[in-house]
Amino acid sequence: MERKEQTMTFYSPEVIKIKGDLRYQRPTLPTNQQSVSTQKRQQYVNEACTYIRMFCGSLSGFSVLLLACTSPLNLVQFLVNNNGLELKAGLWTLCYHELCWSHTPKPPYYLQYSRALFLISILFMLISLGLLLSSCRPAERMMSAELDLKVSMLSFCSAVSLLLCLNLFLAQVELYTKNAMEYEFLWTYYLSWCSEVLYICVGIISFLNFITFQFHPPDEGVSADLWQKSRLGIGPVPKTLSATAERSRSEMQFLSGRQEKLQNVRKGKLATTRL
């Protein structure tokens, strides 16, 4: 027996076509007409600012750790022209050769200024990192937009200090390699420049976070006195109670009391009519 082929047809309903109007061809999707409440929107903004601060804190910590690991290493390699001797030195390390520098300060003091600016850069970044870490604690004062501005300024100051430090170290190297030696920077020197880029990124992100937080000020009707830990256990999440909820609760209590009074009055009238 021959099998009949099963065919499937798609149902296309008739659509009323209006001449010159092509809107019927545009599909319309259902939209949610319920707008987000002010309390919920403010909570989303606070959580976003907190996560951005945590990201900036991780970048700051990584950059400080990178500088701390590369600072005791050699940054430049020298090649003596006469005998082909290779020497290595860094910001805090010496090559112990007569052609290299020593710890004794000598004018124009490029090395000493470079070391001082390096310490200043680390200090600024540690202060910024401390502010970012303290903002993750449940404290209402740390949710202000001034914190992001402070972190941005400290990050830019740290970036400028590190930039001057690296440029002065370059001037120190060129001063000692004018005639007798040639130099070549090592990979640790370029990692220091990576820390410079991270400092600038932290400053830019914190400044953008400050601008965003200014356009979304905290709502006065929302009380952020009670705090609870987030799912990650790091960032603060406010446990708020809006004034509208309290008002609706008081209205419900008033209406329920009024209904009880009306029921009591009706019961009293029924009792009198029976008598």
UniProtKB/Swiss-Prot annotation:
Transmembrane spans: 60-80, 116-136, 151-171, 193-213
CC terms in the record's Gene Ontology section: membrane
Keyword Transmembrane among record annotations: yes
Membrane-topology annotation of the record: Multi-pass membrane protein
Location within or outside the cell: Membrane
Pfam families named among the record's database cross-references: PMP22_Claudin
Primary site of residence: membrane
Lineage top rank: taxon: Eukaryota
Record keywords: Membrane, Transmembrane, Transmembrane helix
InterPro entries: PMP-22/EMP/MP20-like (IPR050579), PMP22/EMP/MP20/Claudin (IPR004031)
PANTHER family, per the entry: EPITHELIAL MEMBRANE PROTEIN-RELATED, TRANSMEMBRANE PROTEIN 202
Name assigned to this protein: Transmembrane protein 202
